[in-house]
């Protein structure tokens, strides 16, 4: 769950799901070593008979799969939301499809909230993130900046029944260029813990409004669109 200050979410995975993450790592390892081999020798002989509630589906997103798994998953969760979708992301550099999905969700009365850092790690990425605030706010999306520190979490929760916890940022590097992974949680007890953590984070964060955009427009609007031209490379 969320680590205060850094603003990250950690998840412990046991059982068959943990083996899936091992296979993801070995596939990437073998790719860079230009080698092939069986992974079964790395599989531990442990009892996986302890059945918990709900389902956990590990997934990976990489430039080798031929499909943008992370981006597609995020868009699908936003499109499927009926009541709410809450998103934590260090960077908010979104393509037209993702921007449209967020705006349409808010316009159909889905409670859409996004938390980004108040303290950046990269100033130019920070400006690009903020340059997207106004368009989303005008559509009804609620945006927060995490004031205690940098938020590193990449977490989505939808309608209290589906959540994604992983390494995929909302930017082109994560969606198209990086080896990333995550876990999709469905009807698990842990989803309630994630939601409670998110509401605690909302309380610690500053909610951004149109007035904030107006007060900062000269700082953000001039450089943001210029940097957005470079977003396919970032």
Name each region found by the language model:
Residues 1-10:
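Single conserved hydrophobic/aromatic residue that forms the stacking wall/gate
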Residues 50-51, 79, 174-175:
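Short, flexible turn/loop "capping" segments at secondary-structure junctions
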Residues 70-84, 107:
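Long hydrophobic segments that form regular secondary structure
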Residues 84-86, 91-234:
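PLD/PLD-like phosphodiesterase catalytic module centered on the HKD motif
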Residues 20, 27, 80, 193-200:
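A non-catalytic, amphipathic alpha-helix used as a structural packing/dimerization or gating element
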Residues 16, 21, 27-76:
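Active-site cores of enzymes that catalyze phosphoryl transfer or operate on phosphate-rich substrates
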Residues 5, 80-82, 152:
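Alpha-helix C-terminal capping/helix-to-coil transition sites in glycosyltransferase folds
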């Amino acid at each position: 769950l969320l680590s205060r200050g850094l603003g990250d979410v950690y998840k412990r995975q046991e059982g068959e799901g943990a083996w899936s993450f091992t296979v993801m790592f070995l596939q990437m390892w073998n790719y860079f070593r230009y080698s092939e081999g069986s992974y079964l020798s790395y599989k531990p002989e442990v009892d996986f008979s302890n059945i918990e509630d709900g389902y956990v589906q590990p997934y990976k997103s990489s430039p080798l799969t031929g499909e943008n798994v992370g981006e597609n998953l995020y868009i699908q969760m936003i499109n499927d939301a009926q009541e709410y979708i809450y998103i934590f992301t260090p960077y908010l550099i979104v393509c037209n499809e993702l921007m449209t999905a967020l705006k349409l969700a808010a316009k159909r009365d889905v409670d859409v909230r996004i938390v980004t850092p108040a303290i950046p790690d990269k100033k130019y990425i920070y400006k690009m993130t903020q340059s997207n605030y106004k368009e989303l706010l005008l559509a009804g999306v609620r945006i927060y900046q995490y004031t205690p520190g940098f938020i590193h979490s990449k977490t989505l929760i939808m309608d209290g029944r589906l959540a994604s916890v992983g390494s995929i940022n909302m930017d082109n590097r994560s969606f198209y260029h990086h080896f990333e992974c995550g876990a999709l949680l469905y009807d698990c007890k842990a989803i309630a813990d994630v939601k409670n953590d998110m509401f605690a984070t909302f309380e610690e964060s500053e909610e951004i409004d149109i007035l904030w955009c107006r007060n900062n427009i000269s700082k953000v609007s001039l450089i943001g669109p210029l940097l957005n031209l470079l977003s396919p490379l970032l």
